[in-house]
Regions:
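Short alpha-helix plus adjacent loop in nuclease-associated cores
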Residues: 146-166
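Substrate-binding/catalytic groove segments of enzymes
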Residues: 158-159, 181-184, 209
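Acidic, divalent-metal-coordinating active-site segment for phosphoryl/phosphodiester hydrolysis
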Residues: 191-202
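Short, hydrophobic alpha-helical segments
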Residues: 204-210
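Conserved non-catalytic scaffold segment of RNase H-like nuclease domains
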Residues: 10-137, 142, 165-180, 184, ...
């Protein structure tokens, strides 16, 4: 912990510079129209949006067209073994990937035009985007979201007495419930782009049952 705090302190001046440059690139990014309804998913080095970092962000529209998909090289983390065991993204895989700030303007252009954001535990994804200075607190709170995980939890019906609510289920469970074929897109499960397609599929299935 002491080592981590020392590293963060040493990086702070550079992080502030990166943040200023990121804000400037947002202003200068060419204007382009993006869909108002999007599906988003992320992969990260851990669960803390203000200490961990993004490894991949993927965004598709409601018709399944890919709007954004990129891996990222973390600025602070050199390894993330626990997260890697789940998302299968190794340090070697992202060694030559861009840093998040290099894609910040493009990401922001898509998010700033979105009126409706669909995701599986979408709050997790948006908090990481906020923690990476892609969106502000105000923008985060203003987004209209559709959390497929919450919707599916009630459909699946596994009730938690402790939480007095329906238990959240993994995306793989939701996909299996609706017989989703992960191979249809030829992308490995837990890749954030694959998760976007699976989330959209489950979302459409839920809508068709209403």
């Amino acid at each position: 912990k002491i080592f981590d705090e020392a590293v963060e302190a040493a990086l702070l001046p550079y992080q502030e510079l990166i943040w200023k440059l990121t804000e400037k690139t947002k202003e200068l990014y060419p204007k382009k129209e993006y869909p108002q309804t999007i599906v988003i998913d992320t992969e990260t080095t851990g669960l803390d949006p203000f200490r961990d970092e993004l490894l991949q962000v993927s965004i598709i529209d409601e018709d399944g067209n890919v709007l954004f998909d990129s891996y990222f090289k973390p600025l602070k983390h050199k390894e993330w073994s626990k997260a890697e065991s789940v998302n299968h993204i190794s340090p070697k895989m992202v060694a030559d990937a861009p840093y998040i700030n290099e894609k910040a303007a493009e990401l922001y252009a898509i998010l700033s035009q979105a009126h409706w954001i669909i995701g599986y535990n979408v709050d997790f994804d948006l908090r990481f985007l906020m923690g990476s200075d892609i969106i502000t607190d105000e923008e985060y709170n203003a987004f209209r979201t559709e959390d497929v995980m919450i919707q599916f939890a009630e459909i699946y019906g596994e009730y938690s007495v402790y939480h007095e609510d329906y238990k959240w289920q993994k995306l793989t469970t939701a996909a299996a419930y609706y017989d989703y074929d992960w191979n249809v897109k030829g992308i490995e499960a837990h890749n954030s782009l694959a998760d976007c397609f699976a989330t959209l599929f489950v979302y459409h299935k839920i809508l068709s049952e209403e």
